[in-house]
Design a protein with these regions (language model features):
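A short acidic, glycine-rich active-site loop
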Residues: 58-78
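Small/aliphatic-rich secondary-structure junction motif
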Residues: 2-63, 90
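General small-molecule cofactor/ligand-binding pocket signal
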Residues: 34-36, 96-100, 150
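Short, flexible loop segments at boundaries between secondary-structure elements
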Residues: 147-158
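Glycine-rich, Arg-bearing micro-motifs that act as flexible, cationic patches
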Residues: 119-140, 158
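Short secondary-structure boundary segments
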Residues: 37, 123-125, 153-154
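Short, structured coil segments at secondary-structure junctions
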Residues: 137, 145-146
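Structural beta-alpha unit
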Residues: 74-120, 156-158
Length: 158
């Protein structure tokens, strides 16, 4: 595994995925680790069926420069700085950060393809019934991916 994409946000599952990766990193020893944070447009799931890709692209462009987008960017920077520091403290080399905007599973899959990664690592909340109603980003990534996906379940999840 030379190129790994580690999808991160500010959830417990993400923190545990990063912690697990940091412990295993000496064995894996990747050349490149991409920390990816996806800025999710709130309400995206409600408008999924109503907007196609061109309309979503227009919405993303419209948000550029707004207070809302700036708040999303500050949050993304804080999250990526936190995980970059954790990787540095564990002597992980080759760390890159990336921010994308949109539906998390779509953006993770697209980034993985564009960057030619060998594996995706993502935290999982581990809730047994939540995916029945709202779907699960980690489950969707695992189902759609043609490369290995490591799901790290949060301890203490039900």
């Amino acid at each position: 595994m030379k190129n790994i994409l580690l999808a991160v946000d500010d959830t417990k599952g993400s923190k545990e995925a990063v912690s697990s990766f940091a412990r295993a990193c000496k064995c894996i020893n990747p050349d490149r680790l991409i920390l990816l944070h996806v800025e999710k447009l709130e309400g995206r799931s409600l408008i999924d069926g109503m907007l196609g890709d061109p309309e979503m692209a227009t919405l993303k462009e419209t948000l550029e420069g707004t207070d809302y987008k700036e708040a999303l960017d500050r949050r993304a920077k804080r999250i990526l700085d936190y995980y970059s520091k954790a990787m540095s403290e564990n002597d992980v080399q080759g760390v890159e950060t990336m921010v994308r905007v949109g539906h998390p599973a779509d953006e993770i899959m697209q980034a993985a393809a564009e960057e030619g990664v060998d594996m995706i690592i993502i935290g999982s909340r581990g809730k047994r019934t939540s995916h029945l109603f709202m779907g699960s980003v980690s489950r969707e990534v695992a189902d759609r991916s043609e490369i290995p996906v490591l799901l790290v379940k949060s301890s203490g999840s039900t």
